[in-house]
Amino acid sequence: MALCLKQVFAKDKTFRPRKRFEPGTQRFELYKKAQASLKSGLDLRSVVRLPPGESIDDWIAVHVVDFFNRINLIYGTMAEHCSESSCPVMAGGPRYEYRWQDERQYRRPAKLSAPRYMALLMDWIEGLINDEDVFPTRVGVPFPKNFQQVCTKILTRLFRVFVHVYIHHFDSILSMGAEAHVNTCYKHFYYFIQEFSLVDQRELEPLREMTERICH
């Protein structure tokens, strides 16, 4: 029998500290609206649509932070099964290998272990979310012109976490009775990125068959 989400994903398993929205802000109200829709049992395709009169950048920002929290929690639960020895390369099966590149330590694409890649990824996303120039939280402060491009890069890299977890650690998901919860999170993520064309279709190829099966 599948366990409830709180039982499956213990809070102390979070890979990085959970990001929260400031109460009283527009972003917080949007987050509450999105969560209420999720809990209402509405079709996930409907849940991700931009509410009338709302800013698309605010809507995307709320979801990027929420997906970061959720995927961070999923990977944190799997992390003990994802080691330097078990996953020496960040990959999605034999056909897909993901290399890390940033503006600091790895200026050229680097072949890294999955846990090292994940640690760098979560640090990188956390830095962007905490950067007021990228994710402004003050009323009246506009988003940067390249905001959606930044979010595309974040979401593309988060999708790779799903790829690695599904292909290399699905047995762990099953053993915890977490399949339904991870699938729901994936479907929510997938419908969102499709709704706003935020991830290149080629990036989705590793999970195409599974996606066609569960996101029909």
From Swiss-Prot:
One function term, GO molecular function aspect: metal ion binding
Annotated keywords: Metal-binding, Zinc
Residues annotated for Zn(2+) binding in this entry: 82, 87, 164, 169
Function as written in the Swiss-Prot or TrEMBL entry: May regulate the activity of kinases.
Family to which this protein belongs: Belongs to the MOB1/phocein family.
Protein name (database record): MOB kinase activator 3C
Species this protein is from: Mus musculus (Mouse)
Highest classification ranks of the organism: Eukaryota, Metazoa, Chordata, Craniata, Vertebrata
